[in-house]
UniProtKB/Swiss-Prot annotation:
PROSITE patterns: RIBOSOMAL_L10E
Gene field: rpl10e
Keyword Transcription applies: no
Classification via HAMAP family: Ribosomal_uL16_arch
Upper taxonomic lineage: Archaea, Thermoproteota, Thermoprotei, Thermoproteales, Thermoproteaceae
SUPFAM superfamilies: Ribosomal protein L16p/L10e (SSF54686)
Organism in which the protein naturally occurs: Pyrobaculum arsenaticum (strain DSM 13514 / JCM 11321 / PZ6)
Protein name, entry field: Large ribosomal subunit protein uL16
Length: 182
């Protein structure tokens, strides 16, 4: 069956549905990598700048959208910056299991099936629940690659169903503070 459009799952309705031990047939998380680029601590210490893609509205982002955004950003940065010159992390994990009450969708199906009110549905996918101000993507880089990082995040944001913003700042000193905060 085809995948329903993202507008069907963008808004949060009800409590999270995450307990896999009670869900039979829950789909696997189809995001193979959460860390891209240079992942060694020694190499990351040479990157003085940080970029964050931050979500502005509460909602759900399906794992297909997260994977598409991750691929867009990673491929662009690999092509124009090189794997050794950046670190990129996808910060959210799609734990919430989406349900779908499948209905017949063909000519004359209205006479065959009327459905059921408030039907529970069967597992159909996964999504990450996000809140305003939550970081979706985190990147470390050198100042000369700032334009490429912004473009990669812009391309990744075009694959997501919620509005986002890009924040660029100097890397902190390890205790959660940035260099400009003192």
């Amino acid at each position: 069956m085809p995948v329903r459009p993202a507008r069907c799952y963008r808004r949060i309705k009800g409590p999270p549905y995450t307990r896999e031990e009670y869900i039979h047939g829950a789909p696997m998380i189809q995001i193979p990598k959460f860390d891209m680029g240079t992942t060694s601590a020694a190499a990351r210490a040479t990157f003085p700048m940080v970029a964050k893609l931050i979500v502005e509205e509460r909602g759900q982002i399906r794992m297909q959208a997260l994977e598409a955004a991750r691929q867009m950003a990673s491929k662009y940065l690999t092509k124009y910056v090189g794997d050794a010159n950046y670190y990129l992390r996808l910060n959210v994990i799609p734990h919430h299991v989406l349900r779908e009450n499948r209905m017949l969708a063909m000519a004359g199906a209205d006479r065959l099936q009327e459905g059921m009110r408030l039907a529970f549905g069967s597992p159909a996918g996964r999504a990450a629940r996000v809140e305003p101000g939550q970081i979706l993507f985190y990147a470390e880089f050198k100042p000369e690659h700032l334009a490429h990082i912004k473009e990669a995040f812009r391309r990744a944001a075009s694959k997501l169903p919620l509005p986002t913003r890009i924040v660029i700042e100097p890397k902190g000193d390890g205790d959660g503070k940035t260099a400009t905060q003192g």
